């Protein structure tokens, strides 16, 4: 596990304190938000990994002070994250004709209903930030979508 520098720890603390502010300024963050905090810090852990290091399934089950958050974050830094090939393989499942396209509606369904479920608002934001273009039949080229999502962060539009 890589050792974090003091500057990195300070950055973690800043983001942690922002979530603490939203949670009531009690010096802790709800463990339900552990994955969200980590995603804001640039890692994309799977939910099962978040649960393994102390994340919870429901709000209010447990709070994490920074002293407990830090080792959880460090543990998640080393967890496997999805690769471009993984995402392409997943989208191919929905590409019935093997042409590299899926419908925009199906993309929305995949993102909101399967795996790491996103809210409709999150999907709207992703589509906006990636400047996702549908063809005349309402299909999107999923390779372009995956590349744009994985390239983040996005400039202000």
From Swiss-Prot:
Keywords: Motor protein, Muscle protein, Myosin, Repeat. One of its GO terms (molecular function) is calcium ion binding. SUPFAM superfamilies: EF-hand. The keyword Repeat applies. It comes from the Eukaryota. InterPro entries: CALM/Myosin/TropC-like (IPR050230), EF-hand-dom_pair (IPR011992), EF_hand_dom (IPR002048). Residues 7-44, 82-117 form the EF-hand domain. CDD domains: EFh. One of its GO terms (cellular component) is muscle myosin complex. The keyword Repeat applies. PANTHER family: MYOSIN LIGHT CHAIN 1, 3, MYOSIN LIGHT CHAIN ALKALI. In molluscan muscle, calcium regulation is associated with myosin rather than with actin. Muscle myosin contains two types of light chains: the catalytic light chain, essential for ATPase activity, and the regulatory light chain, a calcium-binding protein responsible for Ca(2+) dependent binding and Ca(2+) dependent Mg-ATPase activity. This is Myosin essential light chain, striated adductor muscle.
